[in-house]
Regions:
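Bacterial N-terminal signal peptides that target proteins for export
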Residues: 1-6
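Cleaved targeting-peptide boundary
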Residues: 20-28
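C-terminal terminal-subdomain/extension
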Residues: 112-119, 125-126, 131
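Central antiparallel beta-sheet cores of small beta-barrel/beta-sandwich binding domains
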Residues: 29-115
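Sec/Tat signal peptide C-region and signal peptidase I cleavage site
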Residues: 14-20
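Edge beta-strand at a domain terminus
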Residues: 123-125, 131-147
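Short aromatic-glycine motifs in intrinsically disordered, low-complexity regions
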Residues: 73-79, 127-134
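Cleavable N-terminal signal peptides
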Residues: 7-8, 18
Length: 147
């Protein structure tokens, strides 16, 4: 009886590990003001355990002509092609579905923000919060996983 109980307990205790997802993969970025798709970002894990996100696709939108280069961006992003640009850097997994300590670049404005991210329970949405100083002074976006 004890072995049966222990087996069931261990099964449920470790089941979340087998279903755990991380943020690696391709994500559709969505304009937080209009809801229109902006492009795709591929998030990969670096050898030091941090996560980096690179623009892999720019989605054409009515009334918007995307920039080809990161004109107003600080070094090391200045005058680099936007396609292939690392817009997320140094993001670290903190616990469970939470990621912190990263930086995110807005290639349209050239501004770099501190970044936190939280993966949804089903792993299909990534809630990003870019901010300066404190998280209250920031902006949020929800990205959708591309399958």
């Amino acid at each position: 009886m004890f072995i049966k109980f222990l087996s069931i307990f261990l099964l449920f205790s470790f089941s979340h590990i087998s279903f755990a997802q991380d943020i690696t993969g391709v994500w559709q970025s969505v304009d937080d003001l209009t809801g229109a798709p902006k492009g795709q970002v591929e998030i990969t894990q670096e050898s030091d355990g941090t996560y980096t996100g690179k623009i892999t696709k720019i989605t054409p939108r009515t009334g918007y002509t995307p920039k080809e280069f990161c004109i107003n961006c600080p070094a090391p992003y200045a005058n680099k092609p936007i396609l292939g640009l690392n817009v997320i850097t140094k993001l670290k997994h903190k616990k469970d579905l939470l990621y912190t300590g990263g930086k995110i670049l807005d290639p349209n404005s050239g501004r770099v923000y501190s970044l936190t991210a939280k993966l949804s329970n089903n792993g299909q949405r990534l809630h990003l919060r870019g901010y300066v100083g404190v998280s209250v002074l920031g902006r949020s976006q929800i990205w959708i996983r591309v399958n």
